[in-house]
Amino acid sequence: MANTGVTGRIPLWLIGTVVGSLAIGLLAIFFYGSYVGLGSSL
């Protein structure tokens, strides 16, 4: 637990940014698909 801010050699904030962007992107695609009518296929 000495390196709480760093996981291996990747900064924790970078992981959070990437995961957050992917989550927002997936939610946007899901809502867009539902709005267009293709949400049932996901």
Curated annotation (Swiss-Prot):
Protein name, as recorded: Photosystem II reaction center protein J
What topology in the membrane does the UniProt record assign? Single-pass membrane protein
State the HAMAP family in the record: PSII_PsbJ (MF_01305)
Q: Which UniProt keywords apply?
A: Chloroplast, Membrane, Photosynthesis, Photosystem II, Plastid, Reaction center, Thylakoid, Transmembrane, Transmembrane helix
The transmembrane segments are 10-30
A family per Pfam: PsbJ
Quote the gene name from the UniProt entry: psbJ
Q: What does this protein do?
A: One of the components of the core complex of photosystem II (PSII). PSII is a light-driven water:plastoquinone oxidoreductase that uses light energy to abstract electrons from H(2)O, generating O(2) and a proton gradient subsequently used for ATP formation. It consists of a core antenna complex that captures photons, and an electron transfer chain that converts photonic excitation into a charge separation.
